Amino acid sequence: MEATARGDVPKTLQTIAYISIPNSADLEFLLWDLQDAIAAYARLSGTTHPSPVDLKADDADAAVDGIVLAVDDAFDDEAMTAVEQILDRLKNTDARAYVIVQALSKNTKQADEALDRLYRACLLRDLPWCDGVVVCAGSDIAALRHSPRMGLLRRPFSEAMDKLVGAIRMGCSIEHAQLLGGGNAGSGEADGMVRAKPALPAPIWHAIIKHLGSRSQSNI
């Protein structure tokens, strides 16, 4: 799944849409983390960042230079239809397409299938595919919202998200952004995606997430 030639050409993104399908606490957290990091890097570098556009609320003529689709691997036909309706509005616009996939299952087969469907949908609409991040953490990752971004629990996902931030800031694919930034382009997978896993063994990870989730609920 290689990035298209246009996806490897840097482009200044003035506007960008962030879409989560379905609307879930986990996907909203991942998009929040991405947007927060984009804003932080812009402040540090003294540059501007793409203005968010709400395609669900704005009129049909709202134009965007890029889109980030956040989905989970329980990606069914209903979710695909919703994605296609959004992508139809961007058809032939040269908008950069990025994705975040939350892998809920233990293996990545379902996530790979979701990626393939999204990639083909972008290809059919002549939208440059610019890769993204697969978060292999199971469910309830939103429980990490108040954990330090570069602490033990969030660090692997933050580092993966930072690569996506770099790509969006350059307006190109993650792989090409790594090359332009002097990083290791080979750190991603063969399909250009960056896959992030917890730094802790699965049993410990799930126990911590369950504990954090319970504590968050008790504080509501």
Where are the model-predicted features located?
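Short, charged N-terminal beta->alpha structural module
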Residues: 12-47
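Helix-loop-strand module that forms the ligand-binding subsite of alpha/beta enzymes
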Residues: 56-126
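Hydrophobic beta-strand segments of well-ordered beta-sheets in folded domains
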Residues: 9-20, 50, 65-68, 94-100, ...
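A short beta-strand-loop structural module common to alpha/beta enzyme folds
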Residues: 41-60
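Active-site/pore-lining binding-face segments in mid-to-C-terminal subdomains
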Residues: 110-174
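Short N-terminal or domain-adjacent regulatory/targeting segments
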Residues: 1-14, 81-85
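C-terminal and late-domain segments of enzyme folds
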Residues: 156-220
